[in-house]
Amino acid sequence: MTWPRQGLAKLLGIEHPIIQAPMAGASTPMLAAAVSNAGALGGFGGSDSDPEELREVVRAIRRLTDRPFIINLYVGRANPYVSAAEDERALKQALAPAHAELGAGEVPDPVDLFVSYREQAAVMLEEHVPVLSSHFGAPNADIVRALKANGTRVIVSATTVAEARHLEAAGVDAIIAQGSEAGGHRGSFAARTGHSGIGTLALVPQIVDAVSVPVIAAGGIMDGRGIAAAFNLGASGVQMGTAFVACPETAANPAYVKRLLHAEPEDAVLTNAISGRPMRVLRNKLVDLLEQHEEHCLDFPEQLSMTRNLRKVAAGTQDAEFLALWAGQGVKLARAMPAAELVQTLVAQAQELLRCHHH
């Protein structure tokens, strides 16, 4: 059976219009290749990889698949970081006991965790990456033009209709309509972040009506029911992150996966406290601790950098209480199965439902 809307699959050169969200920290070349080889679009979150690491990742994926794949990068910040000495001091004080308890040494100074977007984009051009997505807005017009001229498809997240219109004007090939149910960072860039939090069900048809490029639904989609619903809302495809975290091919910490597989939807909270930008994670001691000191929250990504040593130690000891546990509201539907099998299951479920509706 074919999908109700073919545009996106044709645009991206894939069989099934399902994108595995390129999640920084959880994605691996193995996961990306497994998903792509199954006919969907596998991805790798490269936001915190330096340019040469990124090049190696792209080549590693290409050794495992000859199919298209997607790399995600964060668009760099608009304004330089303004040091907030008082807030930094308060946070260091707040985080010191946890560092002592976990044996994580001194609380580190804040740093900008992200490499230059331009340097990363240069590697994307040199390596002819098939699909590039960006979070927190569209790359500069010159970069978008260069990527498109080079054969790379550019897709970007929008959390409001206004953002979607802005992205279409910026020349992106497709738009991810990211509902507030989504795990990880909200891709907001023009909206006053955190105020409206429009859900997927409401956002998708409004963006579909507002733009002429294909729309990819994201946020809370976990199974064939969600995929079929997205198509019925006018989407041309879906992007799913939380659904893939428990696949054995990911780099997700075992403690994170275990917590994810036992979580309730209300455990997935939207907070600025982890990174300095709104992101949905499972509530744990780290969230509680940082939320108690939310008035001292630094900018993104300096806020995230304050807990880098703590999270590193917690990852080593598999302590889920001090990890950033990215998860969307569909978390209870997460399944631990190999990525290829998950793709096949999703396709079968969705097509069964869509077949019924289209007769």
Question: What name fits each language-model region?
Answer:
Residues 1-210, 346:
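Active-site entrance/lid segments in N-terminal catalytic domains of soluble metabolic enzymes
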